[in-house]
Amino acid sequence: MEDGVYEPPDLTPEERMELENIRRRKQELLVEIQRLREELSEAMSEVEGLEANEGSKTLQRNRKMAMGRKKFNMDPKKGIQFLVENELLQNTPEEIARFLYKGEGLNKTAIGDYLGEREELNLAVLHAFVDLHEFTDLNLVQALRQFLWSFRLPGEAQKIDRMMEAFAQRYCLCNPGVFQSTDTCYVLSFAVIMLNTSLHNPNVRDKPGLERFVAMNRGINEGGDLPEELLRNLYDSIRNEPFKIPEDDGNDLTHTFFNPDREGWLLKLGGGRVKTWKRRWFILTDNCLYYFEYTTDKEPRGIIPLENLSIREVDDPRKPNCFELYIPNNKGQLIKACKTEADGRVVEGNHMVYRISAPTQEEKDEWIKSIQAAVSVDPFYEMLAARKKRISVKKKQEQP
């Protein structure tokens, strides 16, 4: 026995030599195993370092992506620019459109604003965005539900026009033969959107029936009428289920009366049989004129939407500094407005004109200036009229 290693006494010299070789080989293997362990340990350390580095890069990328989304929600153009510059988004219409279509963490109002811009890149992104929607075998209401949920329509007429034109082109491409032209699809789309508002807005008292909806859309199919069954299906779909319009944080009505365009005391001439002047606290904001009995009231006594209204100075023998809100080319219709009765009921206003008196000439001029800046023409009606006129002209040109 050597060094505590047992060795049988009856071994031949050859067997002893072989045993020595085995022992030496064993020692070499142990050294090799130790070396491999050390190399493996070094490799694992390197891998862990690489993983930590990759994790850090991923974390950094995610942070930059979140920052880019926030920038987009505040300023869409700058947000896209930030993402492109940081190589988080390719600067192609298709990739930008896919980013907006996925919409993760994006404000849908900001998406609508970006898609509505007139710059060359934005227009290309709009068409790429619309092409991501699959409208095949969907009726018009189903397609509009999908489209209008992917962003929030902006308020500017020209932006809405471009976006709805792109929608009409895509719908007709996916469903050839349903309409004779994209103009027909465009006009009917607006008619459906307005129907949704009329049927489901609690401030609209006069709810249109199927017959009126059908009559509204006569002659829009290149001068011909659309099948009544198609219109009935669209009408029933909207009546049974309104459009779901995206609502982003911070746009709720609790902020309506903060930072108004103008506010102050004015006299308003009543619309009843006995015309009396009543002092009211007026607030001008969001293209609406609200009036209250007291400045501390939380709910207005009346609301006058300024859509499609005009304003003019008038002389009144009873009160100085007067002006009127009126409907241009009015044919006996009442201004769309509502007021709260003493018993709490909300009823439609009873005014063909609203006559108002300011305390001074200067205040009258300021109110007129502010209201003129706020008065807006409803873009739906404006664009619808223009497109219907185009269909009518086209029909006349085709007649022998």
Curated annotation (Swiss-Prot):
Result for mutant: I303A: Reduces ARL4D GTP-dependent interaction and targeting to the plasma membrane mediated by ARL4C, ARL4C and ARL4D
Keyword tRNA-binding annotated: no
Effect of E156D: Inhibits GTP GDP exchange activity. Abolishes recruitment of ARF6 to the plasma membrane
GO molecular function, one term: guanyl-nucleotide exchange factor activity
Membrane-related topology note: Peripheral membrane protein
Top-level taxon: Eukaryota
Protein's job: Acts as a guanine-nucleotide exchange factor (GEF). Promotes guanine-nucleotide exchange on ARF1, ARF3 and ARF6. Activates ARF factors through replacement of GDP with GTP. The cell membrane form, in association with ARL4 proteins, recruits ARF6 to the plasma membrane. Involved in neurite growth.
Assembly behavior: Heteromer. Composed of TAMALIN, CYTH2 and at least one GRM1. Interacts with ARRB1. Interacts with ARL4D; the interaction is direct. Directly interacts with CCDC120 through the coiled coil domain; this interaction stabilizes CCDC120, possibly by preventing its ubiquitination, and is required for neurite growth in neuroblastoma cells. Interacts with ARF1. Interacts with FRMD4A. Interacts (via N-terminal domain) with INAVA (via N-terminal domain).
Protein name: Cytohesin-2
Organism name: Homo sapiens
Gene: CYTH2
